[in-house]
Regions:
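Iron-sulfur cluster-binding electron-transfer modules in prokaryotic oxidoreductases
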Residues: 1-222
Length: 222
């Protein structure tokens, strides 16, 4: 989930309800500043795609507005930003670099997974085949970014609920691949990826990107 102006909202993942829940969040944001900021790549994927539907699909837009009975129909006006996009585009990685008090000073691999990058047209987050935004953040925080082939492949996602063995194979393959390219640590922007990749047999630590921010900016222990 996520908060907007102190109000707890949820992306509501089930297929039938996720669009209506996301539309309500988008409409709320429209009337309270016009931007919706997400921390979770799964939430971001759902909300960004629903927003695209509300802009471009007359049928979806009409049905959603009729059901929600908004005072003013919602048509995709809200700008949806992932927190990392906000750091890059609104704060600036150069500005963040100037605030670093404890450079990370280690080799870190970015793990994008699926949901931040695909479908690329709707997400428009970064190049789906060769993303760089998280590597740029790592560098700004004083770390050495490590690129490796499996950084934008699937971690196993919700398969872990029914087939832990298959997810374990994905986890170990990704960790082994990252380690073979020199990564000492992995960083992700997806809670599910974090869950699936932790405790790998390769001993490659996996953290959320906010943990690196807190460490580099000197607020980790506060």
């Amino acid at each position: 989930g996520y908060r907007y102006n102190g109000k707890l909202l949820t992306c509501d993942a089930p297929a039938k309800s996720r669009k209506l829940s996301a539309v309500r969040a988008l409409e709320y944001a429209k009337n309270h500043g016009g931007k919706l900021l997400t921390l979770c790549s799964a939430c971001h994927n759902v909300i960004k795609r629903v927003n695209a539907d509300m802009k471009n699909d007359d049928n979806v837009r009409t049905k959603a507005n009729n059901y929600c009975s908004f005072e003013t129909p919602y048509s995709g006006e809200t700008e949806v930003l992932h927190y990392i996009e906000m750091l890059k585009n609104l704060v600036g990685f150069d500005a963040i670099k100037q605030k670093v008090v404890k450079p990370l000073d280690r080799k870190i691999g970015a793990y994008y997974g699926c949901l931040l990058l695909r479908p690329s047209k709707e997400m428009a987050f970064d190049n789906p085949e060769n993303p760089t935004i998280i590597e740029d953040l790592i560098a700004a925080l004083g770390g050495t970014p490590v690129k490796y082939p499996m950084r934008n492949e699937c971690c196993g996602a919700y398969v872990s609920l029914k087939n832990e063995e298959l997810t374990a194979k994905r986890r170990e393959a990704i960790a082994k691949n990252a380690k073979s390219y020199g990564a000492e640590e992995l960083v992700t922007a997806c809670p599910l990826c974090l869950y699936n990749l932790q405790n790998n047999a390769e001993g490659v630590k996996t953290v959320y990107f906010t943990e690196l921010l807190a460490e580099a900016l000197g607020v980790k222990d506060e």
